[in-house]
A protein has these predicted regions:
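A cross-taxon signal for low-complexity, glycine/charged-rich
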Residues: 1-4, 10-18, 24
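A contiguous loop/helix-start segment that scaffolds small-molecule binding in enzyme catalytic cores
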Residues: 21, 31, 182-289
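Class I S-adenosyl-L-methionine
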Residues: 21-134, 140, 279-286
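Class I SAM-dependent methyltransferase SAM-binding "motif I" and its flanking Rossmann-like core
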Residues: 23, 111-183
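Short beta-strand segments
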Residues: 34-35, 103-106, 137, 161-164, ...
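Short, solvent-exposed amphipathic alpha-helical segments in soluble enzyme
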Residues: 47-51, 69-70, 118-121, 151, ...
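A polyampholytic, Gly/Pro-enriched intrinsically disordered region
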Residues: 99-104, 152-163, 181-185, 237-248
Length: 289
């Protein structure tokens, strides 16, 4: 073998037990999937920052890449938010060519973000992609940032549901939401509303009314960790009316029957969900008992 060749030889047993020499490409590229957190640079983990610093190529949705400063010798590959699998395939191709790639998401890359798209593309892609070293670095997702700002609303059992029907039918969304409401989870709603989907949050909150008291605390947490951060603690009844004020930067959190608020003079109330739970009057297969 030419000593300058980028290929190396490995030996495997074939099905008959014979020894056969095979050639496999040397792996020089890598792919790291990171989350930048919800906003402030202080919430980017050191591991995620190190991956960004080491990358030759950054791949992601344009607004997320805009949060990363330009640097000589590093290339940004921006794309639209509706081409996640195509974006992931592009990142894998770059890594296969020997580039050190960071796929950039907001929040946590494994929560309604790019990590799943990368593995979907990997499974469907060519076999040579399987030798690419892939690392997923965790990040702070929006529901954790919002919960920290409010107090401890996720102190009990909770779940997260995306209201977007871009990747799944709306009847799947409503079926999951209905089950979560009937089980009395605290429910974190991602992607609550967009220009193309202006009605879905209102529909979700109307559904919640069938399973929760009107005074149930609901958080509207917008752009947490950014200069335009806004956190509102509403009742469920108020939230139904305010649904149109949310946008894609808003995380909506519907409390459980046990979720409480602590009023404060001149400041937003604290919201928390106790860890201890007695039998809930709301947990039925049909909603209210």
């Amino acid at each position: 073998m030419d000593p300058g060749s980028p290929l190396r030889s490995v030996r495997d047993d074939d099905a008959k037990g014979d020894r056969a020499e095979k050639r496999a490409p040397a792996v020089t590229g890598s792919l790291t999937i990171i989350g930048l957190g919800p906003g402030t640079a202080e919430w980017i983990t050191p591991a995620a920052q190190a991956a960004v610093d080491a990358a030759s190529d950054l791949v992601g949705y344009g607004p997320y890449l805009d949060r990363v400063p330009e640097r000589a010798g590093r290339t940004k590959h921006a794309s639209d938010n509706r081409v996640e699998v195509e974006r992931a395939s592009h990142a894998l191709r770059l890594a296969a060519e020997g580039r050190k790639v960071a796929v950039v998401s907001g929040g946590d890359p494994g929560v309604f973000a790019m990590a799943a798209a990368v593995f979907e593309a990997l499974e469907a892609g060519p076999a040579e992609w399987l030798v690419i070293p892939i690392t997923v670095e965790p990040g702070i997702t929006a529901m954790l940032a919002a919960a920290a700002r409010a107090g401890a609303p996720l102190g009990g059992d909770f779940c997260a549901i995306s209201l977007s029907d871009n990747l799944k039918p709306w009847d799947v969304v409503t079926a999951r939401l209905t089950a979560a409401l009937a089980a009395d989870f605290v429910i974190c709603l991602y992607n609550p509303i967009s220009k193309a989907r202006p009605w879905q949050l209102g529909a979700a909150l109307e559904l919640a009314v069938k399973h929760r008291e009107a005074e149930t605390p609901v958080l509207f947490a917008r752009a947490v960790g950014r200069p335009d951060e806004n956190l509102r603690v509403l009742t469920l009844a108020e939230a139904v009316t305010a649904a149109g004020t949310a946008d894609m930067a808003t995380l909506v959190m519907i409390g459980a029957s046990s979720t409480r608020r602590i009023a404060r003079d001149g400041a937003a109330p604290y919201v928390y969900t106790p860890r201890s739970v007695t039998k809930s009057p709301w947990v039925t297969s049909q909603g209210r008992t």
